[in-house]
């Protein structure tokens, strides 16, 4: 099965979060940086953030960006986590 760009980025960032590249409480790179890194649009990155929030891996803070959620909030029933 072929994954779309959004799914590939969700898997990549999710793996980095679970693997410890980004520790709980730390910020993820800004939307613009992620757009550049993954060569995609802001709409795709926002969709990625929505997916990661649904998995409870990140929290969005208004005017501050995306932050890694505490481990006790992660949705361990999700197979991607």
What are these regions (language model features)?
Residues 1-81:
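Short linear motifs at protein or domain termini
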